[in-house]
């Protein structure tokens, strides 16, 4: 096999196919972009700075050549150990939450100076598809996860009411095989989820 490109472990930044980029609701001209860590610009993209360490599991054995064993497209997006979701709280400046494609959830409440692992206890390695903050309560967080890459099609949606200190699986009633892509709370009716 002839491989093209570099091993993921040799790249400075590892991006997901759908690498998150968001604009700040609290700070004009500020954008955040996620690789395996969070980058920030405060000048509309002219300069960027890292505002987090690696927020993934950083599994070296999974950061080799992408696309194998069939084809290596070497496009730089066939990486594992990336941030798949990035959210700024709509309520509070400096509060950012990330979800990774290897199952970790992290929060900063001080604009990236320090980060806390708030992954639900017992959550297996998975793809964190979505992270949402309740429009009614800044401490209420929802996450949608999936383990389809592990041939596990059990839907998994979680809720925290305390900034991720504790979590409850709220997936009851969602049938096996239903893909957990996103969860959102209605902006008008508290507790109504989509």
Mark where each language-model region is.
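Beta-propeller blade termini and top-face loops
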Residues: 1-194
């Amino acid at each position: 096999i002839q491989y093209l490109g570099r091993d993921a472990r040799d790249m400075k930044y590892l991006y997901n196919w759908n690498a998150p980029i968001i604009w700040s609701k609290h700070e004009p001209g500020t954008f955040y972009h996620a690789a395996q860590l969070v980058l920030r610009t405060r000048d509309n993209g002219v300069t960027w700075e890292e505002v987090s360490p690696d927020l993934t599991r950083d599994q070296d054995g999974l950061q080799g050549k992408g696309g194998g064993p069939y084809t290596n497209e070497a496009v730089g997006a066939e990486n594992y150990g990336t941030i798949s979701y990035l959210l700024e709280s709509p309520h509070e400046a400096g509060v950012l939450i990330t979800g990774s494609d290897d199952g970790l959830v992290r929060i900063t409440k001080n604009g990236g100076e320090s980060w806390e692992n708030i992954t639900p206890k017992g959550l297996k390695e998975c793809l964190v598809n979505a992270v949402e903050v309740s429009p009614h309560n800044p401490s209420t967080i929802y996450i949608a996860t999936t383990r389809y890459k592990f041939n596990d099609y059990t839907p998994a949606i979680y809720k925290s009411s305390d900034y991720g200190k504790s979590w409850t699986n709220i997936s009851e009633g969602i049938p096996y095989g239903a893909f957990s892509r996103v969860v959102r709370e209605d902006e008008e009716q508290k507790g109504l989820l989509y």
